[in-house]
Amino acid sequence: MQVSPAIVKGIAVSSLGLYAGILTSSTVISITTPINVLTQHLKNVLCTLGCWSTVLGGLATGAFGLSYYLAAPGERPNYLLCGLGVAPLSAAYLYLVSLFNHKLAPKCTRDQNDLEKQKDEKLPQHHPEVKDGEAACPFSKMNNAKTLKPESERSVKCHSYMSLHMSIVTGITIFTFGKCILDGFKA
């Protein structure tokens, strides 16, 4: 049974598009939501989005690799290599930034100023009021009675640092997705 390169390219580009969409959603949620709501009420939702983005990123990487392999040696377009590398490179980049942010940077600890800033953060317009220990995300499996481990709570400074890097990766992923679509029409 022979696999059509066009079908594999379609799967690759579709997976990359879904990956870019999930990454964009995660970034928007992270930027617009105060850190205390993220760590207390939306942590499971973001973890689920992370799992799905890993699956879709792996599928896109595999499909782009297979498309590149199936293409004739003289007709291997560059966008296949771009699509092949974007998910693993973005995952590695975010992992290293997160590692630096949470393990190696001693300045990313909570202090009294962070707690005051966090209390002053505004929720998005028309969002119900969230008080510590009362509200929970309807999609979260987390029980309100459970307390978080201290290392899962991050400072406002760390939150803004990670949001910046997530925005960078999201922009690069969306650009690569657009490049794959436009270059795919040329071929």
UniProtKB/Swiss-Prot annotation:
Domain of life from the UniProt record: Eukaryota
GO BP terms, alphabetized: autophagy of mitochondrion; macroautophagy
Transmembrane segments: 11-31, 45-65, 80-100, 162-182
A GO cellular component annotation in the UniProt record: mitochondrial outer membrane
Topology of this chain in the membrane: Multi-pass membrane protein
Subcellular location: Membrane
Amino acid composition bias (Basic and acidic residues), ranges on this chain: 114-134
PANTHER family on file: AUTOPHAGY-RELATED PROTEIN 33-RELATED
Protein name, per record: Protein SCM4
Organism: Saccharomyces cerevisiae (strain ATCC 204508 / S288c)
Source species taxonomy: Eukaryota, Fungi, Dikarya, Ascomycota, Saccharomycotina
